[in-house]
C-alpha cells in the first residue's frame, strides 16, 4: 500500500499531514472523505507512539470535572457514543466501580460528579450510574476490608492502536496516500505551496507539493515546527509520561475499578486481554521526545502501592508481566503539576497572506480525535463538503450495531467452524465484519505461528494494514506479544524477513 503513481511534485495535494497517530489519521480520514487529495507521512509505524500507549479508554474524563473542564468533558461524552456507534468491534462499553474512600472526596461530591457525568453529554447508549453496597456485592469481593460504599458508572474500552489503523485505512480507501516509515526531512513555503521532501529508511528522497500542511507529529510537533519547517512560532508543548503495568488477572468479573489516591490522582485497574489486568497511569514530566519513555522504578512502586491499598491481595512487582509507557504531547497551559495540565486540544494556524497555511496540533485525547479533525479542517477553511460525515460512517469492519456483536460472532463461527471460539472472538474484535476476508469458509487454518496467529492473518496484516515488523503485529495490530514465547517470536521474525 503506497502512494498513488500520479503523486509527483507537479501535482499538489490539498492537504499534507505530518504524523500518523490518532490525530493525523483522523484528519486524513475526514479530509479524504470530503473529496480532498490527502497525503500522510509517519516516520515510524502508524499509531506507534502516543496513540498505542494510552490507558485504552474512550471516556469523558471524570476527573477533569475537578478542573472545571466542562466543555472538554461534554465534548468527550458526546464523542464516546459516536465512536461506539462507528467502531463497535474495537470499542465497547465498560462499567467502572469507584469505591468511596472516607478520607478523600466525600460521597456527596462523587454523586454530584457522576450526576454531571451522566447528563452533560446526553447519554443514550450506556447505562446510568448506580450506588453499590460493596459489603454485599460481588464487586466488593476483590477489595480490602472497609470499602463499604461504591458507585458504578459507564465508559468505553478502545483498542487504541487499531483505532489509528482503521482511520488510516479508511482514509486510504477514500483516496488518501498513507506513507508509514516515511520521514519528512524538510518542508518550505514557496508562495501558495509547500515543497516537501521525505525519505524512507535506506531510500532516496522524494519530493511532494501540498497546498496546506498539518503538523500533527505529537511529541515531535515542536521539533517539526522548528527543525523541519523552520517556523518562528513558539511551540508551547509539555510532554507528560504515563506508565502502566500488566499483571495476571486479579479478579474474575468484567468490571474495571477507578481508585482515588491521597495525592489527588486516580488510577484504573482494567480487565485486559481476557487473562490480565491493566493498572495505570502515572503523570511525570518528560524532557526529550527522542528518549524512549520507559517506566521508572518509582512509577512501579507507586502503581503497586496505590493498587495494593484497595485490593485484598497486595500487588507485587514480581508478578508484573509487561509494562509500557507513552508520552502525552499536551499544550503547556502553565499548570504546576503534570496531572493538572489540560488534556484539551489547541490548534495553531500560521497563514500569512498569500502563503501556504500551516496548522500545528497540540494536545488532545484519543476520545476527541474526530472533533479535533473537524476543527482542524474548519481552521484551514478549505472548500469542501460539509463537516460531520465521520460521525455517521462506520470505520472499516464496524458496519454493525453495537448490540449486535454476539449475533455477528455466531454467524462467523457458523461460516468458519474450523476456527476455535477464542480465535473467532479475537478476529471479530480486531477486524469486525472484515474478519471474513482473512480466511475462506471451511479453510483449515493450519498450525499457528505462535499463540493463535496463523499465516492467513499475517498475510492480511502485511497486505492491508502496513504491518512490516514483528512488533507491528504483536503489539499494535494485536496484543499477541503477551502470549508469544521466544520460539514463536523467532518464527514470526523469519517469516517477516527479520
Where are these regions (language model features)?
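Extreme N-terminal leader/targeting segments of oxidoreductases
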Residues: 1-15, 30-33
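Short hydrophobic core segments
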Residues: 18, 208-218
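Glycine-rich Rossmann-fold phosphate-binding loop(s) that bind the pyrophosphate
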Residues: 20-21, 43
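Glycine-rich FAD pyrophosphate-binding loop
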Residues: 32-52
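Dinucleotide-binding Rossmann-like beta1-alpha1 core, especially the glycine-rich loop
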Residues: 56-140
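C-terminal catalytic lobe of FAD-dependent flavoproteins
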Residues: 154, 160-162, 170, 229, ...
Amino acid at each position: 500500500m503506497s502512494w498513488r503513481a500520479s503523486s509527483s511534485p507537479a501535482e499538489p495535494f490539498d492537504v499534507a499531514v505530518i504524523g500518523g497517530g490518532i490525530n493525523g489519521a483522523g484528519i486524513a480520514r475526514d479530509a479524504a472523505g470530503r473529496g480532498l487529495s490527502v497525503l500522510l507521512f509517519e516516520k515510524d509505524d502508524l499509531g506507534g507512539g502516543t496513540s498505542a500507549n494510552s490507558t485504552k479508554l474512550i471516556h469523558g474524563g471524570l476527573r477533569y470535572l475537578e478542573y472545571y473542564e466542562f466543555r472538554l468533558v461534554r465534548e468527550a461524552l458526546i464523542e464516546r457514543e459516536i465512536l461506539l456507534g462507528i467502531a463497535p468491534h474495537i470499542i465497547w462499553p465498560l462499567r467502572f466501580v469507584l469505591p468511596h474512600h472516607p478520607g478523600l472526596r466525600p460521597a456527596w461530591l462523587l454523586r454530584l460528579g457522576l450526576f454531571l457525568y451522566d447528563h452533560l453529554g446526553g447519554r443514550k447508549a450506556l447505562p446510568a450510574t448506580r450506588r453499590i453496597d460493596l459489603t454485599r456485592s460481588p464487586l466488593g469481593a476483590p477489595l480490602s476490608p472497609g470499602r463499604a460504599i461504591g458507585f458504578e458508572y459507564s465508559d468505553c474500552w478502545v483498542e487504541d492502536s487499531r483505532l489509528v489503523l482503521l482511520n488510516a485505512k479508511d482514509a486510504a480507501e477514500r483516496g488518501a496516500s498513507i506513507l508509514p516509515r516515511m520521514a519528512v526531512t524538510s518542508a518550505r513555503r514557496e508562495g501558495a505551496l509547500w515543497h516537501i521532501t521525505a525519505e524512507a529508511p535506506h531510500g532516496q528522497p522524494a519530493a511532494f507539493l501540498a497546498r496546506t500542511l498539518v503538523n500533527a507529529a505529537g511529541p515531535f510537533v515542536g521539533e517539526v515546527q522548528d527543525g523541519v519547517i523552520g517556523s518562528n512560532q513558539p511551540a508551547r508543548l509539555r510532554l507528560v509520561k504515563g506508565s502502566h503495568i500488566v499483571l495476571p488477572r486479579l479478579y474474575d468479573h468484567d468490571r474495571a475499578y477507578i481508585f482515588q489516591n491521597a495525592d489527588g490522582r486516580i488510577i484504573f485497574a482494567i480487565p485486559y486481554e481476557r487473562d490480565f489486568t491493566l493498572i495505570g497511569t502515572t503523570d511525570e514530566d518528560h524532557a526529550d521526545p527522542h528518549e524512549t519513555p520507559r517506566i521508572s522504578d518509582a512509577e512501579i512502586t507507586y502503581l503497586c502501592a496505590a493498587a495494593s491499598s484497595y485490593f485484598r491481595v497486595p500487588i507485587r512487582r514480581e508478578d508484573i508481566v509487561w509494562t509500557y509507557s507513552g508520552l502525552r504531547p499536551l499544550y503547556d497551559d502553565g499548570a504546576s503539576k503534570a496531572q493538572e495540565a489540560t488534556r484539551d486540544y489547541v490548534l495553531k494556524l500560521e497563514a500569512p497572506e498569500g502563503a501556504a497555511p500551516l496548522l500545528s496540533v497540540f494536545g488532545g485525547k484519543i476520545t476527541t480525535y474526530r472533533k479535533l479533525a473537524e476543527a482542524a479542517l474548519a481552521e484551514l477553511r478549505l472548500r469542501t463538503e460539509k463537516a460531520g460525515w465521520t460521525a455517521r460512517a462506520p470505520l472499516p469492519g464496524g458496519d454493525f450495531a453495537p448490540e449486535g456483536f454476539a449475533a455477528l460472532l455466531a454467524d462467523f463461527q457458523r461460516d468458519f467452524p474450523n476456527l476455535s471460539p477464542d480465535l473467532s472472538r479475537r478476529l471479530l474484535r480486531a477486524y469486525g465484519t472484515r474478519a471474513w476476508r482473512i480466511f475462506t469458509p471451511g479453510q483449515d487454518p493450519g498450525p499457528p505461528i505462535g499463540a493463535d496467529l496463523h499465516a492467513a492473518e499475517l498475510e492480511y496484516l502485511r497486505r492491508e494494514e502496513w504491518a512490516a515488523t514483528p512488533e507491528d503485529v504483536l503489539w499494535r495490530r494485536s496484543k499477541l506479544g503477551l502470549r508469544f514465547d521466544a520460539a514463536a517470536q523467532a518464527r514470526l521474525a523469519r517469516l517477516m524477513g527479520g
